[in-house]
Amino acid sequence: MLYGKSFPICINDIAADLEISNISETEVLILDQNSPMPFRKRIMSADDIVPVGDEVVISCMKSFAHGTEGVMVYKIAYRDKNMVYATDKESYIGADKKLAFFARNTDLLIHDSQFTGEDYLSPIAPKQGFGHSTFEMAIETAKAAQAKKLAFFHFDPSYNDEKLKNIEKYYKDQFEGCFMAYEGCETDLL
């Protein structure tokens, strides 16, 4: 390798000061610029997941749509905006209702979109059960959540840029706010 090992890496290989916090679906993690450390708060009401001032509030839901232990989906809220990060998860044909509820009215849903429906259900080499979603599943979930924008994310490595551009163009007719995420991609939500 040109630059050495890049994946997977050990936590000791990360050149940074890290603060690791475990949170559950019944807690939020609050980052406040006036506090040196994030703190956990138990969710007692819907008000507990709404940021106050310049707080950043991180909440999560457990999705069992991947492997044996599932995967965590995160919502990051700041002021009156939020985004939901749902990767490494296999949604459902017809939308993931639990995720749609968690992501309702989100400004940006970043959703695993590894396969086309054709590749996912291929009679020769099906991908169902691999723990990844299709573009259609992402759109169905975004529509059910009434998300404003949808970032397709985590593509099959065999898909080249031209194929991804064609996929994006095709799905824009079904969900106007969809786009392909890419390295360095930035989206302004404020």
Predicted regions and their residues:
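Binuclear metal-dependent hydrolase catalytic cores
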Residues: M1-V84, E90-G94, A100, D161-L190
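Cap/insert and terminal regions of metallo-dependent hydrolase folds
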Residues: E90-E183
